[in-house]
Design a protein with these regions (language model features):
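Glycine-rich, often proline-containing surface loops adjacent to acidic residues and nearby aromatics
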Residues: 10-17, 92-109, 135-144, 220-238
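Short glycine-rich, low-complexity/disordered patches
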Residues: 45-61, 129-146, 174-178, 258-280
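Secondary-structure boundary elements
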Residues: 111-135
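Short, charged/polar micro-motifs that form catalytic or ligand-binding hotspots
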Residues: 102-113, 245, 249
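A short acidic (Asp/Glu
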Residues: 27-28, 115, 150-154
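Long, compositionally biased interface segments
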Residues: 220-280
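Aromatic/basic-lined ligand-recognition segments
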Residues: 72-87, 94, 136-229
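N-terminal low-complexity, intrinsically disordered segments
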Residues: 1-97, 278-280
Length: 280
């Protein structure tokens, strides 16, 4: 039978990404990092790590691509877990800053209200600083769920977990004799200047026996990624610093509501009811 990765929910990771319409300058990036140093310290993300990204700029004359360094920063908190009688540190929360985007990730999801409050405390001051110089290009909400098959792999049936009548999953996975992947997506216009990307990625995987908790070692699993991304076309969406908080709150709540609706279309309704997941 299929089980969720943890008793309270199946969410292995949640990610919220705010993408800028163009890369921030080095001066603004330094201001953003200072804001994040304050906000992340207040929430307990005390581990810091510099990261180096790059973008390719095309020169007009020779049409050559020139790599340009883009310094960024990771802010992380860790939690102690026990894996096969060994105590290990694993990342529990992370804020990633690159001149192109800000992202908040959690591996210890409890509830939407709690996570929205946390990510707002972490990201809002930085976004308020960023919109003084640039516009917002996109906002994305992504859930990665994992389900574990507790039994003989020969008895695995994808339709016991997934809805075999949805057009969001490739139908051939329900007759696949072994591992499979189904990645689908579509764009829908929201307004004349924005569109929404909906993504559903289903990946059947056999977990390694080494380095995994006993509940996962050697098991057949299904990872289910559902994501919604609102993209603001042309020159992006412009805000004043005072308007950002209201926009971010309403935007994230709207994406969350539609993410629940997307989940209902993908998960087998009987399984969802039995495990108190969103269902019809």
């Amino acid at each position: 039978m299929w089980k969720m990765i943890r008793p309270e929910n199946a969410i292995e990771q949640m990610v919220v990404t705010v993408r800028f319409s163009e890369p921030l300058s080095s001066l603004v990036s330094k201001r953003i990092i200072r804001e994040l140093e304050r906000s992340t310290s207040n929430v307990g993300l005390t581990n810091r790590q510099a990261v180096q990204g790059f973008q390719l700029n095309m020169q007009a004359a020779g049409q050559n691509f020139v790599p340009v360094a883009m310094p960024g920063m990771l802010f992380q908190s860790t939690s102690v877990f026990r894996v096969n009688d060994e105590v290990v540190n694993q990342i529990s929360q992370q804020v990633e800053f690159q001149p192109t985007h800000l992202a908040y990730s959690t591996w210890t999801y409890k509830s939407w209200d709690k996570e929205r409050e946390t990510l707002t405390r972490l990201l809002l001051p930085a976004i308020e600083t960023a919109v003084q110089s640039i516009t917002i290009g996109a906002v994305r909400l992504q859930y990665l769920d994992r389900f574990v098959f507790d039994g003989d792999k020969a008895a695995v049936q994808a339709r016991d977990l997934l809805n075999d009548e949805t057009d969001l999953i490739a139908p051939n996975i329900f007759t696949a004799p072994d591992l499979y992947h189904s990645h689908t997506g579509r764009f829908d216009n929201v307004t004349s200047r924005s569109r929404r990307l909906s993504q559903v990625n289903v990946d059947s995987q056999d977990m390694l026996s080494d380095g995994q908790p006993d509940a996962l070692a050697g098991r057949r699993t299904i990872s289910l990624l559902t994501a919604l991304e609102d993209q603001f076309l042309e020159s992006g969406k412009e805000f004043s610093s005072e308007e950002v908080a209201g926009f971010l709150s309403s935007q994230l709540d709207d994406l969350h509501v539609h993410a629940l609706a997307l989940s209902k279309r993908v998960i087998n309704n009987k399984f969802a009811q039995e495990h108190r997941l969103p269902h019809e």
